[in-house]
């Protein structure tokens, strides 16, 4: 299992955006004594995403992230939901030559997300 991990300047706002914009589901949120998100677990399209609050002294905060999420359902509707929640859609839903349909956007902190129906197979 591979679990992408993100660090956000405002992890509370990121969790709210991921729920509203992408339809992800909050599983657990652990806050530090200072009230910031130390660790959170989000259910995402049949998989998981972990996230926390960025810290200036952390070796993990090296820049923005990018991930492709395979979704079941209407890519165009997913794109519109994300856009309505504030995602910056920079590549509209497109049918790909290799199969599937997908789009790409940035969340409010600049991480790149692509959502689509293409899933690699072993066959």
Identify the residue ranges that each predicted region occupies.
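Vicinal oxygen chelate
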Residues: 1-5, 15-108, 115-123
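Conserved beta-strand-loop-alpha-helix junction that forms the acyl-donor binding cleft
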Residues: 8-10
